[in-house]
Amino acid sequence: AMGDYLKALGDRDSWWFMFFYSVTFGGFLGLASTLPGYFHDQYGLNPVTAGYYTAACVFAGSLMRPLGGALADRIGGIRSLLMVYTLAAICIAAVGFHLTSAMAALGLFVVAMLSLGAGNGAVFQLVPQRFHKEIGVMTGLIGMAGGIGGFCLTAGLGAIKQSTGDYQLGLWLFASLGVLAWFGLHGVKRRWRTTWGSAAVTAARV
């Protein structure tokens, strides 16, 4: 019912999870949509080769989702996500410096997508620990936030490319979102680990 969604949205943690997932899954979707054009425009690759490069990135990110969940089980979802945002932000910011080698850019994008894929798994390792009874509602809201994040990133990168003739600013803004997510997670880390994520409440690593 609509009331369940409104009640869930009244909890500040739901907004944090929606933001964290909009960066990981939204970033994954946005890059998957943007990379074919990026490799073509930036390096003059033909559409088929650009498609292969993009497929390698998407495959890497998809493969890492379950592995990211397993890693989060082992070391904790918060620690996993902090690593994810660090790696993704560094790689995407580095690509923004107009690398001369398409292979170097591909390598950095693969690492970024591996990180974002792992982040998708890590977010959903944490969600059931925080929202026991509202898991269905929260899964829907967080998934929606990921989709909206992907749309906004794709549209934003495209608009910035069109207005500046370059992907640099868009990539750096996306990297800065990763930095923002890192600081946001670092800010709630202590509260989460001493309330619903404490050893007295859950056996899972948070």
Predicted features and spans:
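Extracytoplasmic gate region of multi-pass secondary transporters
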Residues: 11-63
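Multi-pass alpha-helical transporter architecture, strongest
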Residues: 175-206
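C-terminal transmembrane helical hairpin of 12-TM major facilitator-type secondary transporters
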Residues: 77-123
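Juxtamembrane intracellular "pre-TM" segments in multi-pass secondary transporters
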Residues: 1-17, 202-206
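Helix-to-loop junctions at the C-terminal end of transmembrane segments
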Residues: 64-76
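Paired intracellular helix-loop junctions of major facilitator superfamily
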Residues: 126-136
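Interfacial helix-cap and linker-helix signal at transmembrane-aqueous boundaries
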Residues: 39-40, 71-72, 156-165
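A membrane-interface helix-boundary motif in multi-pass transporters
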Residues: 159-177
